[in-house]
Amino acid sequence: MTRFLFAIILGFLLTACQQVTVEETEYVPHKLTELRVGTLYGPQIYMTSGQGNSGFDYDMAVLFAEYLDVPLKMVPYTNRAELYDALKKNEIDIIAAGMTETPARREQFRLGPPLYRVNQVLVYREGMPTPKDITDLKGKITVIADSSFVETLTQLQKRHPTLVWDQVTDKDSEELLAMIANKEIDYTIADSSSVQINRRYLPDLRSGLVLEEKLDVVWLLPPTHSDSLMSQLLAFWHQEKLAGTLDHLNEKYFGHVKRFDYIDTRAFLRAIETVLPRYRQLFETHAGDLDWRKLAATSYQESHWNPNARSPTGVRGMMMLTQPTAKEIGITNRLDAKESIRGGAAYLRDMINRLPESIPESQRMWFALASYNIGYAHVEDARKLAESMELNPNAWRDLKKVLPLLQKRKYYQKTRYGYARGSEAVHYVDSIRRYYDTLVWVDNQSKQQNSDEEEPSDLASEDGPAPVPGTLSPDKPK
């Protein structure tokens, strides 16, 4: 019965997803021996760094290639016009670039099922007057050419004929957001998810008017001769939706960035410049098989990198260790930065090793940090509670929902270890994830800057502009 219903849904989606009205071009059959995915650079789309590849679209593309049982080839482009042209010419099989569904795209391409939703927001800088209306702007709007933002402005212009804007072809959304923060332009339009991610590094960004709400982010397929690929994509999407993959990736890339503290973010960026250099070598030395930046992020959350930090509850030092924990791991002086960092790393590593093997490697750190905060026993209580509620005890996205319940008598009276401040643990882990993301960004920026200084400026690549800061150069489109 389930298969029958899915077949009906699949057929409906294939025929009703959209009607594409484009000119027929000569079609050269392409046997799918690899999945060629056209994309753009961006932290939520596709990035490459020393830690490997990442991005919501990239992670989904990896899974789709595995589903099709073919190798994946990511092909990044520098602008949307080239990307669209490549798809129409059959140089790529699909576009996965964080693009929203729009009428113009629906007319030109076939649109895949929704991955997540975003709002389109007007972005301005801290200190500027808050716009009350699109006509109440004290400056000019700058947007990316061929973007969905141009479509939005074009529609708004019909109601507000005096509305004007600039379009750029040699910048991406990340660069425009940086230009807002650096006072180089007045306004831009961006997806809400992009603003949430980038304000961790650019805290002066502000979201103003919501111009479009709840837009689906989708993949684009060729307008013709793509029935088979669309059918496979829909079946894959259905499978991953049921498996919770979309929820997992949504939490992975966006779940921890929704909270934002302007003052804290600015203070953290200052601390990276002024305080971290004194202790970075200690974090790198004692991290061992851990990412030193996760260790440093944990330390900042604990003590703001203050080796003399103390709390009324008796925890002390850079890693805010309790006396029993320090004794257990052989630390004699908790106020010594070197000992505290060494002890914190050892304790965190022990938390990771104690976790059940059923917890995926990519999520073990978040479970371990929750254990570091409220204790391993309470995390195990939460996992058992999740299981009883038919949630996944091995998925951080589900544990985040359950941990706050440990503060409610209805739930904690059924657990072995009782009450715990579970909501505090969720906030604790989310904060560390934000600090970690910022450290990775700053570290990559520094490496890119050092690399640029080492290379002669007249040896520019003929392939076009370099990747965004913090990325390595994967295959360029031929």
Swiss-Prot record:
Murein-degrading enzyme that degrades murein glycan strands and insoluble, high-molecular weight murein sacculi, with the concomitant formation of a 1,6-anhydromuramoyl product. Lytic transglycosylases (LTs) play an integral role in the metabolism of the peptidoglycan (PG) sacculus. Their lytic action creates space within the PG sacculus to allow for its expansion as well as for the insertion of various structures such as secretion systems and flagella. It catalyses: Exolytic cleavage of the (1->4)-beta-glycosidic linkage between N-acetylmuramic acid (MurNAc) and N-acetylglucosamine (GlcNAc) residues in peptidoglycan, from either the reducing or the non-reducing ends of the peptidoglycan chains, with concomitant formation of a 1,6-anhydrobond in the MurNAc residue. It is found in: Cell outer membrane. The active site is at E302. InterPro entries: Lysozyme-like_dom_sf, MltF, Solute-binding_3/MltF_N, Transglycosylase_SLT_dom_1. GO terms for biological process: cell wall macromolecule catabolic process; cell wall organization; peptidoglycan catabolic process. Residues 23-257 are annotated as: Non-LT domain. Its EC number is 4.2.2.n1. It comes from Shewanella sp. (strain MR-7). Residues 1-22 form the signal peptide. This is Membrane-bound lytic murein transglycosylase F. One of its GO terms (molecular function) is peptidoglycan lytic transglycosylase activity. Pfam families: SBP_bac_3, SLT. Residues 446-478 are annotated as: Disordered. In the N-terminal section; belongs to the bacterial solute-binding protein 3 family. In the C-terminal section; belongs to the transglycosylase Slt family. Its main location: membrane. Residues 451-461 have a biased composition (Acidic residues). The N-terminal domain does not have lytic activity and probably modulates enzymatic activity. The C-terminal domain is the catalytic active domain. PROSITE patterns: PROKAR_LIPOPROTEIN.
